[in-house]
C-alpha cells in the first residue's frame, strides 16, 4: 500500500514538473524587424549607449526580444551604410500582430517618452537622422532564436 501511495505521489510530481516545464518553454520567434539607423554625425555611440542603458530594457519590459545590436565594421555606399554613423539592431516577436501590440505598449510607456521621444523631437538633442525598418520572417531550419511567450 505504501509503495502505491509513493508511486502515485511520484507520478503526480512528475506530471506537475512536466506541465510546469511546458508552461515555461520558450516559443519560437515568428517575426523579426531589422532596424538600420543613421545617427547624427558623431552621435552613433551616444545612440548605442541610449539603447544599452535604457531603450533595450523598455522593449524587454514589454515582451520585445532584443535579438542583437550591431555596429558596422565597414562602410557600404550601395547600402547607405556608414561605419561611423550607422547603428543596426534586430527585434523579435512571436508574430506581426504581437509586434504591433508590444511596440505600441513600449512607445506608450512614459519612460520611452522621456528617454526617446522627447530627445528625438528636439532638433538640438536628436540622435537619429533617419531610420529604416525591414520586416523579416524566419526561413528554413537555421533560425534558432527563441523568445519568451
Range-by-range predicted roles:
Residues 1-9:
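Bacterial N-terminal signal peptides that target proteins for export
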Residues 137-149:
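Acidic/histidine-enriched, glycine/proline-rich intrinsically disordered or flexible terminal extensions
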Residues 9-26:
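Bacterial Sec-dependent signal peptides at the C-terminal "C-region" and cleavage site
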Residues 77-83:
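Short glycine-biased active-site loop of nucleotidyltransferases that positions the nucleotide triphosphate
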Residues 66, 71-74:
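Intrinsic, low-complexity N-terminal interaction/targeting segments
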Residues 37, 42-47, 54:
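Extended non-catalytic domains of envelope/secretory-pathway proteins
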Residues 26-27, 50-67, 83-84, 92-134:
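An amphipathic, aromatic/His-enriched active-site/gating alpha helix that lines ligand/cofactor pockets
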Residues 31-36, 47, 85-92:
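Short, structured motif recognition centered on aromatic/hydrophobic residues
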